[in-house]
């Protein structure tokens, strides 16, 4: 079955261009030029991935991302005409999984869409060579890969697809340090550059907050300075 992609961008030429490229890849596309018109589609929940522009005429793209994250965990890719690092960090903080800066090459967006859907539907990190069980646990933390559920002391923890994937990689390698380069390659399936470190840092911070693990001596995700992270 074809995945359903939601596009919300008030720049009609960009939205139309993305629609053409996505349909050429056999995706089902729901395209809107403002957030208001897209609300019924969003509320239906029948979406596999959303592409949101930050600057919309009727709603801030960040606010829309936050609204979606209250109910849904499907991947969100933000489009921005700005290049400030703060925009990227803000989007990731509110639950976005990736961002693309305008102007962009349509094929780059398609590649990112495929990567996000691949990770969301079926995750298999590249740095893990042995078969990993469907359920992983450490102390009071439990991660079920098949149901995409995270439990902390028996209570559900809502994670974005990227947060789930990062935690999966680290938990699958419990006791060992996972370098930032390995983590980036495993989760994003892309080459690591030093500028990507802030992306990892933001997601790790969110994970710690959701796991109530923000003390100076974290119980779960530990930072090994200059190397990476471990559980």
Locate each region found by the language model.
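Short hydrophobic/Thr-rich beta-strand motif most characteristic of the beta2 strand and flanking loop
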Residues: 26-34, 41
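Active-site beta3 strand of CheY-like receiver
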Residues: 46-51, 56
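Short, Lys/Arg-enriched segments at the junction into DNA-binding effector domains
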Residues: 4, 115-164, 168-177, 181
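Basic, amphipathic DNA-recognition helix from helix-turn-helix-like DNA-binding domains
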Residues: 60, 66, 70, 75-137
């Amino acid at each position: 079955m074809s995945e359903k992609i939601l596009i919300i961008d008030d720049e009609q030429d960009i939205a139309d261009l993305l629609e053409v490229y996505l349909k050429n890849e056999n995706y089902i596309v729901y395209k809107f030029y403002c957030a208001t018109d897209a609300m019924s589609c969003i509320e239906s929940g029948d979406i596999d991935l959303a592409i949101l522009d930050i600057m919309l005429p009727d709603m801030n793209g960040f606010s829309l991302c936050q609204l979606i994250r209250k109910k849904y965990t499907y991947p969100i890719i933000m489009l921005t005409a700005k290049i400030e690092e703060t925009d990227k960090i803000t989007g990731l903080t509110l639950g976005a999984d990736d961002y693309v800066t305008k102007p962009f090459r349509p094929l780059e967006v398609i590649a990112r869409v495929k990567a996000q859907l691949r990770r969301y539907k079926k995750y298999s990190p590249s740095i893990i060579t042995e078969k990993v069980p469907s359920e992983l646990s450490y102390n009071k933390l439990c991660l079920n890969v098949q149901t995409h559920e995270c439990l902390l002391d028996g209570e559900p923890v809502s994670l974005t697809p990227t947060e789930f994937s990062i935690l999966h990689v680290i938990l699958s390698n419990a006791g060992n340090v996972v370098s930032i380069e390995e983590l980036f390659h495993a989760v994003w399936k892309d080459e690591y550059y030093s500028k990507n470190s802030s992306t990892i840092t933001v997601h790790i911070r969110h994970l710690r907050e959701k796991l109530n693990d923000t003390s100076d001596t974290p119980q779960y995700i530990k930072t090994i300075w200059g190397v990476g992270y471990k559980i």
